[in-house]
UniProtKB/Swiss-Prot annotation:
Coiled coil: none annotated. A motif (DXD motif) lies at residues 223-225. Pfam families: SseK_NleB. Changing C39S: Mutant used for crystallization; prevents protein precipitation due to irregular intermolecular disulfide bonds. GO terms for cellular component: extracellular region; host cell cytoplasm; host cell cytosol. This is Protein-arginine N-acetylglucosaminyltransferase SseK1. Mn(2+) binds at D225, N322, S324. It comes from the Bacteria. It catalyses: L-arginyl-[protein] + UDP-N-acetyl-alpha-D-glucosamine = N(omega)-(N-acetyl-beta-D-glucosaminyl)-L-arginyl-[protein] + UDP + H(+). Protein-arginine N-acetylglucosaminyltransferase effector that disrupts TNF signaling in infected cells, including NF-kappa-B signaling, apoptosis and necroptosis. Acts by catalyzing the transfer of a single N-acetylglucosamine (GlcNAc) to a conserved arginine residue in the death domain of host proteins TRADD and, to a lower extent, FADD: arginine GlcNAcylation prevents homotypic/heterotypic death domain interactions and assembly of the oligomeric TNF-alpha receptor complex, thereby disrupting TNF signaling. GO terms for biological process: symbiont-mediated suppression of host apoptosis. Belongs to the glycosyltransferase NleB family.
Length: 336
């Protein structure tokens, strides 16, 4: 018997670019005439939150360094998720120059809620996703220099050469460059890295209670302003990936506030990483996620973007989405 689709059901567009069909024991969805399997995330697929803190000193030295105010109860949202989803592992992916007492507070949080696992960025090996900055700049310089002089962007060429010469010894690394950012890029880049690891992230962190996960298990990332109201249950996602979609004035936009994958090294995120390895000015959000997904599904600008967003959207009735937009604190940016 084919299980019913969960609350995630790709919507039908007016021009029928998107449709859902079933075939024997496999369910399919399609975009623009091509079928993709609906991959199943079971009720034990781990959830992952993230908190990268620029300034741990703004918190008490013995407090959990995650914002938890009346307007922005991010820590409470995570704890609520752990309480509702007791059968799931709940990861909190963290980075920052934390005080010893703050790390102790994280450990106490893990003790109080056995399914919460605090995963420190510097405990995870992301080197397999790295590339030398010098190689990225040299490849782009060579591309410019190979063009006929009349088509060459001389200003860009000089800029690339300057950026190449400014790389400091020991910092010739794409991954390290985002450790110096401490802004959106820091958050977004390492979120992508974590979701490339997916369930393997929990195994690599060597946390008690994580050993039942397979090295290829999936993961669901949620921003800390996403509020879980009831258990999520099993979820189907197209070709093993789905993301949050914002809609403003009828215009849809893919967002990285939710990223769900059914396995590690998902091809769409690897496609985004390839762009990060190729473009000298790549953005981890618009290129690493959005353009990687577009590339994976062969989306072109000739196709209906809103329909594509319907197709790739992570939908669920038991999540109140992006609540920080109501408190002027959302990190959301809109790209098409």
């Amino acid at each position: 018997m084919i299980p019913p689709l969960n609350r995630y059901v790709p919507a039908l567009s007016k021009n029928e670019l998107v449709k859902t069909v079933t075939n024997r024991d496999i369910q399919f969805t399609s975009f623009n005439g091509k079928d993709y399997p609906l991959c199943f995330l079971d009720e034990k697929t781990p959830l992952l939150f993230q908190w990268f803190e620029r300034n741990p000193a703004r918190f008490g030295k013995n407090d959990i360094p995650i914002i938890n105010t009346e307007k922005n109860p991010y820590l409470n949202n995570i704890i609520k998720a752990a309480t509702i989803e007791k059968e799931r592992l709940i990861g909190i992916f963290v980075d920052g120059d934390f005080f010893p007492g703050q790390k102790d507070a994280f450990s106490k949080l893990e003790y109080d809620y056995e399914n919460i696992k605090v995963i420190y960025r510097n405990d995870i090996d992301f080197s397999m996703y790295d590339k030398k900055l010098s190689e990225i700049y040299m490849e782009n310089i060579s591309k410019q220099e190979s063009m006929p002089e009349e088509k060459r962007d001389c200003h860009l060429l000089q800029l690339l050469k300057k950026e190449l010469s400014d790389i400091q010894e020991g910092n010739d690394s794409l991954i390290k460059s985002y450790l110096l950012d401490k802004g959106h890029g820091w958050f977004d880049f390492y979120r992508n890295m974590a979701m490339l690891k997916a369930g393997q992230l929990f195994l690599e962190a060597d946390k008690v209670g994580c050993y039942d996960l397979s090295t290829n298990s999936g993961c669901i990332y949620l921003d800390a302003d996403m509020i879980i109201t009831e258990k999520l249950g099993g979820i189907y996602i197209p070709d093993g990936i789905a993301v949050h979609v914002e809609r403003i004035d009828g215009r849809a936009s893919m967002e990285n506030g939710i990223i769900a994958v059914d396995r590690n090294n998902h091809p769409a995120l690897l496609a985004g990483l390839e762009i990060m390895h190729t473009k000298f000015d790549a953005d981890p959000y618009s290129d690493g996620v959005c353009n990687g997904i577009r590339k994976h599904f062969n989306y072109s600008l000739n196709e209906d973007y809103n329909s594509f967003c319907d197709f790739i959207e992570f939908k669920h009735d038991n999540i109140i989405m992006n609540t920080s937009q109501f408190t002027q604190s959302s990190w959301a940016r809109h790209v098409q």
